[in-house]
Amino acid sequence: MNNRTVDRCDYNVGEYINNRYRVSQTLGEGSFGKVYRVTDSASKDYALKLLRLWEVPPEIRKPLMERFEMEFKTGQIDCDYLVRSLDYGTVGGNPYIVMEYCSGGDLTPYLGSGSSKIPLICQQILIGLHALHTRGKVHRGLKPENVLFKSNGIAALTDFGIAGDRNKRMTERNIFGKPNQIFGTYAYMPPEQVNRMRGE
């Protein structure tokens, strides 16, 4: 894959992705991806995550696509407390994942709220993590923004982009045996991972 085979694919409200999904809202944007709220021909809402390969150096496109495909497969685990991946495709050489749309926002407003719902939410998060772990997956990106609420109020884990597979090593190591890549958000990393980053 090279620059000539990847098109720039930015979408505005009202435009169609692959003549199938109509964009109704931009939900978020990350380093290499953008998430849209889209509707299909039956007017059903979904979240569509587009990997913007046109912004990525050619030499890292292949490993990035491999990780994106693994994200899709992780999202196919059948559990009510995980945001489900429903479709995978490409547009202009850029891959996308279509997922359940969660209309209830994320966990952030509950932090420090003292809400009586928190014990149930924690239970649902743990069930989601258990579903991942029993299939050899490690989320590695658990934070309030990655816990979404479905329309029925159920909490579900999302964003499996940096999820690990206990049966595969995707983290490169340097000549000293230390990881070259550290996955996760610093503020939510366990102390032992932060200590490894510091060389302790």
Which role does the model predict for each range below?
Residues K34:
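Conserved N-lobe ATP-binding subsite of Hanks-type protein kinase domains
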Residues Y88:
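Activation-segment/catalytic-loop signature of the eukaryotic protein kinase fold
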Residues G92-D106:
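Conserved short submotifs of the Hanks-type protein kinase catalytic core
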Residues D106-S116:
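AlphaC helix of the protein kinase catalytic domain
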Residues I121-C122:
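Activation segment signature within eukaryotic-like protein kinase domains
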Residues I127-K137:
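Protein kinase catalytic-loop region centered on the HRD/HxD motif
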